[in-house]
């Protein structure tokens, strides 16, 4: 019996796994049926509809790091080169050729596309492979007779394994509904509608790429000062040289590093850092300030929002209060957004496998080579939490081809059609 892999969210990770599974089947190789459950549409989070962008900002990585990159498959001994060749049919370059945009893209110097164009590429691949998409929002995840069950208002999807993707909800904010506190979705909704933001003192909470994208947009609005609030001592620039990029596209040797070394590498290259392009814009704008601290709480008072910040100084916690006319909550993706969806049976299963409470730290440290929670059957794949254990490229767009290898090479349980293969990523037998 062919196994079923259900994926929550129809973004790049879902498309990458579905495309490789489709090509494996075209080669006559057993692969799971991939069913994607999506509330909005394929690539929605890369458009204004998803709330994470207005669709006009540029992709932060090279588009050539597409759904098959780095094209170094290790799933089918002696036929991996054939699999990679098949995957190039779904590459960024193939999309440009098929849509008569390739020559212009080359002549313009291979620019990063805007988010809207990236979403169009994902839809093009999904259409080409006939990706099975069930439209609906997952409201509950439970254990069923087959394995997992994903419950939407209209239907229930049963699967042998589940992969959870996506950044969570862009609507979350410190003070929901308050007109002086904007969520990520509120911000992009206004900019997509060409509404001018006018304020004296603006606070941007967050020091990562989500906040950076909003800062890049905010420069064009009528604000007097912008204070970026983050826990770091300063606004760090993301390392974008060859050696930093290699960490993302080739995780060989990552597991030989200590946890402390891995965390240090991730903080320097991925978490809480701005791209060099955004940093350059910050340098040219004297309205930008940085305030170190974590926001403990926010209260409206006297027509302003008062933020209480906690800062550690020499081991002592210091509390300060600051007032702003407008607060933008740009804290970004929540890798644990799915936890409230878990039914009690699912929580019990995961806590039993973890040997402790269901925390982000334990989940990260449990992620195995196949990007699933270790010690848990049926499989629950969490690539968004795989950075610490398996490599910093897995949670983002940096090695979608390797990610799909890991997941499709996993043992999906008693009903699985594929045996567990450990990928030999650096020099696969082809």
Curated annotation (Swiss-Prot):
Residues 1-21 form the signal peptide. It is an enzyme of class 1 (oxidoreductase). The keyword Signal applies. Transmembrane segments: none annotated. GO terms for molecular function: L-lysine 6-monooxygenase (NADPH) activity. It comes from the Bacteria. Keywords: FAD, Flavoprotein, Monooxygenase, NADP, Oxidoreductase, Signal. It catalyses: L-lysine + NADPH + O2 = N(6)-hydroxy-L-lysine + NADP(+) + H2O. The keyword 4Fe-4S does not apply. Its EC number is 1.14.13.59. Pathway: Siderophore biosynthesis; mycobactin biosynthesis. Coiled coil: none annotated. Belongs to the lysine N(6)-hydroxylase/L-ornithine N(5)-oxygenase family. This is L-lysine N6-monooxygenase MbtG. It comes from Mycobacterium sp. (strain MCS). The gene is mbtG.
């Amino acid at each position: 019996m062919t196994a079923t892999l259900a994926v929550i969210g129809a973004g790049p990770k879902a498309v990458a796994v579905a495309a490789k599974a489709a090509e494996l089947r075209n080669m006559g190789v057993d692969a799971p049926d991939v069913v994607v459950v999506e509330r909005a549409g394929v690539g929605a989070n890369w458009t204004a509809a998803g709330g994470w962008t207005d669709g006009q900002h540029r992709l932060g990585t090279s588009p050539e790091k597409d759904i098959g990159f780095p094209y170094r498959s290790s799933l089918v001994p002696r036929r991996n080169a054939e699999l990679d060749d098949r995957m190039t049919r779904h590459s960024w370059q193939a999309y440009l050729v098929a849509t008569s945009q390739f020559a212009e893209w080359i002549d313009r110097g291979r620019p990063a596309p805007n988010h809207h164009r990236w979403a169009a590429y994902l839809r093009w691949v999904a259409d080409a492979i006939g990706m099975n998409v069930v439209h609906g929002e997952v409201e509950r995840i439970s254990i069923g007779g087959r394995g997992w069950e994903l419950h939407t208002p209209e239907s229930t999807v049963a699967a042998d394994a589940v992969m959870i993707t996506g950044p969570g909800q862009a609507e979350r904010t410190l003070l929901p509904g308050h007109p002086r506190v904007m969520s990520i979705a509120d911000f992009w909704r206004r900019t997509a509608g060409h509404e001018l933001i006018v304020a004296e003192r603006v606070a941007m909470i967050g020091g990562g790429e989500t906040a950076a994208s909003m800062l890049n947009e905010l420069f064009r609005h009528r604000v007097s000062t912008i204070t970026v609030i983050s826990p770091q001592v300063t606004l760090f620039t993301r390392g974008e040289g060859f050696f930093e990029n290699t960490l993302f596209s080739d995780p060989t040797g990552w597991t030989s590093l200590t946890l402390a070394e891995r965390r240090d590498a991730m903080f320097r290259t991925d978490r809480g850092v701005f791209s060099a392009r955004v940093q350059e814009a910050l340098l040219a704008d004297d309205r930008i300030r940085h305030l170190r601290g974590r926001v403990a709480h926010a209260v409206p008072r006297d027509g302003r929002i008062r933020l209480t910040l906690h800062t550690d100084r020499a081991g002592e916690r210091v509390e300060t209060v600051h007032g702003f006319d407008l607060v933008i909550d740009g804290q970004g993706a929540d890798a644990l957004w799915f936890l409230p969806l878990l039914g009690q049976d699912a929580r019990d299963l995961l806590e039993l496998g973890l040997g402790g409470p269901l925390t982000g730290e334990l989940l990260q440290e449990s992620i195995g080579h196949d990007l699933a929670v270790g010690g848990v059957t049926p499989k629950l794949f969490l690539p968004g939490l795989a950075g610490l254990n398996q490599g910093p490229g897995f949670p983002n767009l940096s090695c979608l081809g390797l990610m799909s290898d890991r997941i499709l090479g996993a043992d999906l349980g008693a009903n699985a059609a594929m045996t567990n293969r450990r990928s030999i990523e650096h020099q696969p037998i082809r």
